[in-house]
């Protein structure tokens, strides 16, 4: 699905933007702090209904404005669809072809055909940072693969909050009543993540070998569940094992007022040559591993959807060494995908530019076309 046109109003520092992107590469040029990332976030928000950065929704509204709005026309096999989302004091509302979600349009219909993958400098820290970032990567990638994950993850968070509150102040009976919905939602999320990792692992190995060469150690990916929960079983058995882990840890959880087993405590393990890349990989190897992981995600979606996802690359080239940047740009140039790239230095992305590349300058929230 291609983004044909984009309208942004009062989103972050963007007062009013009308964009006609290229069907291939659209490059956003400008100094830091001018609004390039905000424009990428507007596209990401439109395609996922979630902010790119962890903020309150109210922070997406431009200072002094009453609300923010993003809308786009997407062309796919079924024709052109218009999706839109608005953020105001009352929260977030979205619509498909003018029909609000929940009253004329379904969430599944909204997300049909919409898939976007974002790659930012923060992602390059994925290997050596804490597990929170790796869990966010998993859940965002799982949502792209199966949009129903959005509702499933929300169900798990609600159940987790309820059980944690019961652990702190409720009776044993109250805690037990919240445990079953937590187990059900947790097992569903565990299985989604497990299945995603199984799909990504061989693609990661292939991409890393291509980036790093035949002499490099083999890359691998594994899902590590907290509390000793083994996830290599049917969903019902995973649920039973999660329930046993919660029962075993019940007294400890009561003392701490916190659930210590479940998807919110799990981790994604990236390895090189059988050793954890977080401890044993060099910075160059870690960055190559993250690049391979992103390519694995893109290729996995390409295989599942029959086309590549929309790509959002936020100044990644400035953080990669020349060899890895050449590899990334060569990959993008060969991929039949629509991509949006931000940069402060046009020279860094020139190898990926083609005759149909669109260039825009972003300055103080104003987006203006440039002659290529």
Swiss-Prot record:
First-listed, main subcellular location of the protein, grouped into a coarse class: cytoplasm
Binding, ATP: 30-37
Gene Ontology, cellular component aspect: cytoplasm
Pfam short name (any one): SMC_N
Disulphide linkage map: none
InterPro entries: DNA-binding_RecF, DNA-binding_RecF_CS, P-loop_NTPase, RecF/RecN/SMC_N, RecF_2
Compartments where found: Cytoplasm
Key words of the record: ATP-binding, Cytoplasm, DNA damage, DNA repair, DNA replication, DNA-binding, Nucleotide-binding, SOS response
GO MF terms, alphabetically ordered: ATP binding; single-stranded DNA binding
One GO term (biological process): DNA synthesis involved in DNA repair
PANTHER family associated with the record: DNA REPLICATION AND REPAIR PROTEIN RECF (PTHR32182:SF0)
Protein's job: The RecF protein is involved in DNA metabolism; it is required for DNA replication and normal SOS inducibility. RecF binds preferentially to single-stranded, linear DNA. It also seems to bind ATP.
Family under the similarity heading: Belongs to the RecF family.
Protein name per the record: DNA replication and repair protein RecF
Organism (species): Anaeromyxobacter dehalogenans (strain 2CP-C)
């Amino acid at each position: 699905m291609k983004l044909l046109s984009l309208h942004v109003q009062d989103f972050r520092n963007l007062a009013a933007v009308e964009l006609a992107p290229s069907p291939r590469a659209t490059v956003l040029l400008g100094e830091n702090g001018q609004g390039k990332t905000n424009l990428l976030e507007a596209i990401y928000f439109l395609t996922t209904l979630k902010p790119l950065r962890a903020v309150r929704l109210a922070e997406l509204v431009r200072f002094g404005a009453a609300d923010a709005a993003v809308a786009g026309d997407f062309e796919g096999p079924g024709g052109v669809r218009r999706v839109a989302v608005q953020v105001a004091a009352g929260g977030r509302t979205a619509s498909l072809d003018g029909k609000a979600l929940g009253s004329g349009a379904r969430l599944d219909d909204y997300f049909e055909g919409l898939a976007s993958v974002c790659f930012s400098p923060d992602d390059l820290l994925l290997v050596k940072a804490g597990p929170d970032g790796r869990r966010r990567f998993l859940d965002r990638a799982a949502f792209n693969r199966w949009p129903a994950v959005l509702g499933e993850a929300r169900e798990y968070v609600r159940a987790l909050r309820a059980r944690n509150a019961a652990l702190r102040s409720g009776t044993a009976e109250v805690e037990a009543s919240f445990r079953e919905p937590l187990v059900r939602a947790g097992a569903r999320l565990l299985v989604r993540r497990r299945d995603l990792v199984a799909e990504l692992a061989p693609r990661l190995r292939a991409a890393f070998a291509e980036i790093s060469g035949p002499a490099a150690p083999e890359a691998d990916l594994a899902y590590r569940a907290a509390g000793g929960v083994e996830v290599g079983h049917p969903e019902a058995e995973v649920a039973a094992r999660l329930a046993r882990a919660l029962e075993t840890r019940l007294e400890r959880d009561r003392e701490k007022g916190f659930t210590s087993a479940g998807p919110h405590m799990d981790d994604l393990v990236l390895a090189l040559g059988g050793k954890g890349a977080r401890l044993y990989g060099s910075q160059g190897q870690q960055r190559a591993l993250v690049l391979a992981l992103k390519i694995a995600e893109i290729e996995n979606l390409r295989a599942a959807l029959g086309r590549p996802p929309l790509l959002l690359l936020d100044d990644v080239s400035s953080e990669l060494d020349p060899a890895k940047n050449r590899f990334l740009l060569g990959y993008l140039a060969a991929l039949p995908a629509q991509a949006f790239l931000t940069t402060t230095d046009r020279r860094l992305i020139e190898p990926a530019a083609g005759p149909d590349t669109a260039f825009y300058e972003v300055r103080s929230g104003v987006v203006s076309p440039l002659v290529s």
